[in-house]
Structure formats: C-alpha cells, structure tokens
C-alpha cells in the first residue's frame, strides 16, 4: 500500500518500502535505446516479485495485458480520423508511433547507457500501491471519495530539500482534513511530487538577442540558464531525477507514517490559519467543528496513539512525458502479470501529447497504473470517448481520471457536452477540475500569474456543471506549494501585481502559495458540505 497506516517508517520489505539506500551510479552499458531489437520485453525484476496488494487473491482487471492488441485508434481532432492498424502492445511499441515533446539528445550513446542503468535500478513505487490508488479513485468516480492532487508545476534540483518537501506535504494534509470534514468522505491525497520534472513546451527553441537555443524542458532534461551548456539535453540529469524522486518519496513515507500526519496536529495548524486569516471568521466555524469532533473521538477512546489518527495514505504522480525514462522504469508485476510504470503511482497525459495515434497514448494503454487525461475546451466529445476506449477498454472504475482545464466560462459551455458524451458511452471516469492552466495571464511587469478569483470561479463552475448534469465532482488538481511565494495574485492575504517579483520562485508556471491553497480548500469544503446536505434533504 502507499504511504499508509499499515506501513512502518523503517521497514525495508518490498511491499512497504521504497528503495534501499545504495549508490546509484551509471555503469558501462551496451544495450541500444533506439536499436532494431525493440521487441525485447521487460524482464521480471526479482526484488519486487513479492510486491502486491494487501489481498493477494484480488487480481485486478485492467485495460490491456501485455500481448493484447490495441483497439482501433484515431487522431484527436474533430475531423474523421484515419484507421490505425491493430498492433500488440510492448513496453517499447510506442517507438513505432509519432512522439511529440521529446528532447533531442546530441549524445545518443550516453543516453542509451543511462537508460540501461535506470532499467537496472529498483522501482520507485510498487504495483500494489498503484492498485490501491485505483480502488480509491473508483470510489471518487462514484461520488464516495474526493481527489486532492497538488504540488509543484515542475520540481527542480535547486530547490530540493527536506523543508520544501515537508511544507508542501503539510499543506496537502491541512487541505485534506478540511475537505474530508466538509464532504464527510475520504480524501485521496496525491502529490505532484517525486518525479514531476519534465514540462511540455509550445516551441522547441527559444531565441534571445539573435541567439537560438533549445527550450528549457525541466531539470531532468536540461538547465534553465540561457547558454549552450545549460540548454543542451543531458542524459545524466535522468540519473539525478531518479535519485531525487526516490529520496523525496522516502521522506514522504516517513512523514506519512511517523506521526507528522497526526489528525490533532493537522487541525491545530488549520486553527492557527484561521486566527491569522483576514477571512478567519468564515473558516473558523468549520475548523472548530473539526476540533470538537476530534475531542469526541478522543473521549470515545480513539486517541492520538491509534494508527488511524497519526498516519495517512499518500501517493505520487507526474505527467507521462519523457517516454524513454518511463519505459526504463516499467516493470512486470508477478502478482497480476501486468506492466506498471514504477516511476509513480499515477500518470497523466497532457493536452499536447494525447493524440489517439501518438506515442504517449500507445505507451499508456499498456501499463496498468491509474491514468489521467488533461482536457481543455478544445477537446471534442467524440475524441474523448475514443481516447477513453483506447486507455480503458474494460471500463474499470478508477482507471481513468479526466482533468478539465478550461477557464470558468468555457467550463460552463464545454464540460456538459463532455459529461453527456461519456455518459452515453457508458464509460466510468473520475471528473477532476484543474483550475490553474486555463487562468494564466501576463502581469504588467511581464511575469506570468493566475488570479485567485479566476481559479475560484472555475472551481465553482465545475461544481455547478456537475450539479446541473447529475454527475460527481471527483476532485481538484492544483499547482501549489507550501512556501510563502507571490506568484498568483489575490487571496485573503492579498497578493498584488506589485508583490509578484518579491518571492516569484517558480521554474515554470505560477503556483498557489500555502495560504491561498488552504483558503481554496475551505471554499471547496463549503461546496462539498452544501452538496452533501442537499442530497440528504432529497
């Protein structure tokens, strides 16, 4: 299971721990990444042969087992798409498709060597953990749980330290407690952490003062400094990204199971927030009710020492973008015989790479992890239905999460058509709102920012549409940090355009700071509570 109450902080058993501490150094390798021997299957990895879900007799039915053929696919456009020949899936069958957003490495031999090294590394996460997450997401699809997914726009090597990881984890815990009380349902906490490095770019090159260099694609590909050395894609960065991901998740496991996530501690943090918030009166009532509930539970014997009160479940996620790296961390699970991408529990395909006949969709259709699909107002309803058919032909609950990113007004117009199309097709999905990407603007100073009011408006539109359609709002997906940055304007502790430059630290897109994130969780909790009380009164 993931970072759960059933695991221990110092266990090194395969079904509980991440990786053992060992040197992770590249070695001389011979196997070619883009060789003609692309039909080689991933070997069984003996160290994870005993890794499975808590109930080893529960063999999940997931989208595609290895050696099964893909359904006919089409391009993700509104025009009729050409038929795609059925092919068997293999861990490297994506190479036969058009792959967008991949960097061009000048040193292919070094890339092959690094990928072979990573292929021999231990998995970062395990199959049983991903299956547990899929089960939880299946509950969210039915309206019986709520997904809270958040973290950095892009993780960086420079800002990698324990305090930053702790602060983001802490704010997710605080938000989760607020949402859980408001909705009276489990909250599935998934971090955009321990692997969210790579970023898609609208242009492969950037030009300044007549100098043209490759675009910055994330710290696992190249550096953000505008010089030839930094911008040249470096395969060794993949090794560092792996090590940082493993170390991050190792620390998260310790936080989740070592008492840091104790419910009483979390609620005290929330009470402190309401004391210092300009709109504290609005949120103090909810925080006080949580405090009263905890007092009742303690009186009933459910004290701080009980595992359920001092531990939590937590999963990791990132965009499936850098396919060579993802392939190198794909392992076959001995319990089910299915392939899992062991770089994260949950992966999503982005707006720029979700072509029905593209390499990213080809790779994702064959792995058994729960998957997300980023959807903008440009998504045609029929194309979405086809994409879901490809990725989840057996229609398994929890397998597919639709992450909508449209802006408030577009949400009210476009989302109903997507919901109706998916419902007509009988497909089971978890609907999630990403209120960040559709609300990016440029400030007068030239920096990108996102108005808190626009983010809040999109969340409200998301709930309004689901109320109107009789469907379930299954969660939120946020770019956020536990730091006191000034990247998004607005919020109760008002950040203005003039404030942006004071603590603008993002390596990519603007993030909600700790206060703004928690404020948004109180707003969502109020909406969940109204929805719950409304359903009870019917």
From Swiss-Prot:
EC number(s) stated in the UniProt entry for this protein: 2.5.1.54
Known regulation of activity: Activation by tryptophan (a hysteretic factor).
SUPFAM superfamilies referenced in this protein's UniProt entry, alphabetically: Aldolase (SSF51569)
Record keywords: Amino-acid biosynthesis, Aromatic amino acid biosynthesis, Chloroplast, Plastid, Transferase, Transit peptide
Catalytic activity: D-erythrose 4-phosphate + phosphoenolpyruvate + H2O = 7-phospho-2-dehydro-3-deoxy-D-arabino-heptonate + phosphate
GO cellular component: chloroplast
Any one biological process term the GO annotation gives: aromatic amino acid family biosynthetic process
GO molecular function annotations of the record: 3-deoxy-7-phosphoheptulonate synthase activity
Pathway participation: Metabolic intermediate biosynthesis; chorismate biosynthesis; chorismate from D-erythrose 4-phosphate and phosphoenolpyruvate: step 1/7
Subcellular location as annotated: Plastid, Chloroplast
Sequence segments annotated as region (Disordered): 55-82
Pfam families cross-referenced by the UniProt entry: DAHP_synth_2 (PF01474)
NCBIfam families for this protein: DAHP_synth_II
Family: Belongs to the class-II DAHP synthase family.
Protein name: Phospho-2-dehydro-3-deoxyheptonate aldolase 1, chloroplastic
Organism expressing this protein natively: Solanum tuberosum
């Amino acid at each position: 299971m993931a970072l759960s109450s059933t695991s221990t902080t110092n266990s090194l058993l395969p079904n509980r721990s991440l990786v053992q501490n060992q040197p992770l150094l590249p070695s001389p390798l011979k196997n070619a990444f883009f060789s003609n021997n692309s039909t080689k299957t991933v070997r069984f990895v003996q160290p994870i042969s005993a890794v499975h879900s808590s109930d080893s007799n529960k063999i999940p039915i997931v989208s595609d087992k290895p050696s099964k053929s893909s359904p006919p696919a089409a391009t993700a456009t509104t025009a009729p798409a050409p038929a795609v020949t059925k092919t068997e899936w293999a861990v490297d069958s994506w190479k036969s498709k058009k792959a967008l957003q991949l960097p061009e490495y000048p040193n292919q031999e070094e890339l092959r060597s690094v990928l072979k090294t990573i292929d021999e590394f231990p998995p970062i996460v395990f199959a049983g953990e991903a299956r547990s997450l899929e089960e939880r997401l299946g509950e969210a699809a039915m309206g019986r749980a709520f997904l809270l997914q958040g973290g950095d726009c892009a993780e960086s090597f420079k800002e990698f330290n324990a305090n930053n990881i702790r602060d983001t984890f802490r704010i997710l815990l605080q938000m989760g407690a607020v949402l859980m009380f408001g909705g009276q349902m489990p909250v599935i906490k998934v971090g955009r952490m321990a692997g969210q490095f790579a970023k898609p770019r609208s242009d492969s090159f950037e030009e300044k003062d007549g100098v043209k260099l490759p675009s910055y694609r994330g710290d696992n590909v190249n550096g953000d400094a505008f010089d030839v050395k930094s911008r040249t894609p470096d395969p060794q960065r993949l090794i560092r990204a792996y090590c940082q991901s493993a170390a991050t998740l190792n620390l998260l496991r310790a936080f989740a199971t070592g008492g840091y996530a104790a419910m009483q501690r979390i609620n005290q943090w929330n009470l402190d927030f309401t004391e210092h918030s300009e709109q504290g009166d609005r949120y103090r009532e909810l925080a006080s009710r949580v405090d009263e509930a905890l007092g009742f539970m303690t009186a009933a014997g459910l004290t701080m020492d009980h595992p359920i009160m001092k531990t939590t479940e937590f999963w990791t996620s990132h965009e499936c973008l850098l396919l060579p790296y993802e392939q190198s961390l794909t392992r076959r699970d001995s319990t089910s015989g299915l392939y899992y991408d062991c770089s994260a529990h949950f992966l999503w395909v982005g707006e720029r790479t979700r072509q029905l006949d593209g390499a990213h969709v080809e790779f994702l259709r064959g792995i058994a992890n729960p998957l997300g699909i980023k959807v903008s107002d440009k998504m045609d309803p029929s194309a979405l239905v086809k994409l879901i058919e490809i990725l989840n032909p057996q229609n398994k609950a929890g397998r597919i999460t639709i992450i909508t990113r449209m802006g408030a007004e577009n949400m009210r117009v476009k989302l109903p058509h997507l919901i109706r199309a998916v419902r007509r097709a009988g497909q089971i999905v978890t609907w999630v709102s990403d209120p960040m990407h559709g609300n990016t603007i440029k400030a007068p100073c030239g920096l990108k920012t996102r108005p808190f009011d626009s983010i809040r408006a999109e969340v409200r539109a998301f709930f309004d549409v689901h109320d109107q359609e009789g469907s379930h709002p299954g969660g939120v997906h946020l770019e956020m940090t536990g730091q006191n940055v000034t990247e998004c304007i607005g919020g109760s502790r008002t950040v203005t355009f003039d404030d942006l430059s004071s603590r603008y630290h993002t390596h990519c897109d603007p993030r909600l700071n700790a206060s703004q994130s928690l404020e948004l969780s109180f707003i969502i909790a109020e909406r969940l509570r109204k929805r719950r009380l409304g359903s009870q009164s019917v």
